[in-house]
Regions:
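Anion-binding (especially nucleotide phosphate/pyrophosphate-binding) glycine-rich loop
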Residues: 1-131, 135, 139, 143-145
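C-terminal substrate-binding/cap subdomain adjacent to the FAD-binding core in PCMH-type
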Residues: 137-159
Length: 159
């Protein structure tokens, strides 16, 4: 975990807007997230992925949490199917390129969509007739109020 005080957010948003945050924490693991959860009860905060869907119009007087949780794993299910696990801090476009390099096809229409994997289920990203929901089996998430790991299967995601 990295912590910065009174930091510029210019490099953390794709508009390149100069704004400052009182504090910014980069999290790299679920342990990092668990450590800061108690602060979220009483402090103003926002989570930030790739910074492509945010426009700062003024300084942010609070805690900015930047998701840097990375990891990719591919597990064969059978001869024709593969189960891919990707952590939420992975860059979406880099993930699509990785799947293609592994010989897993289907996501290529969604290449060059900015942001991180963590935003994909929230927005059901899509392009050229292909949507995230077409390939998502489940989403694992942390309930911020309790720190409990929750798993949402495809129907529970309500795409």
């Amino acid at each position: 975990m990295n912590t910065f005080k009174n930091i510029s957010l210019k490099s953390f948003n794709t508009f390149g807007v100069e704004a400052r945050a009182t504090e910014l924490i980069e999290i790299f693991s679920l342990d990092d997230l668990t450590q800061i959860l108690p602060r979220l009860v009483s402090e103003k905060y926002m989570f930030l992925g790739g910074g492509s869907n945010v426009l700062f119009i003024k300084d942010f007087d609070g805690l900015v949490i930047v998701n840097r949780m990375k990891g990719l794993c591919a597990d064969p299910i059978n001869e024709n199917d593969i189960h891919v696990t990707a952590l939420s801090g992975e860059n979406w476009h880099d993930f699509v390129i990785w799947t293609l390099g592994m010989g897993f096809y289907g996501l290529e229409n969604m290449s060059l969509i900015p942001g991180t994997i963590g935003a994909a289920p929230m927005q059901n990203i899509g392009a050229y007739g292909v949507e995230f929901k077409d390939y998502c089996l489940k989403v694992d998430a942390i309930e911020l109020a309790t720190g409990e790991l929750k798993s949402f299967d495809h129907p529970a995601c309500q795409f």
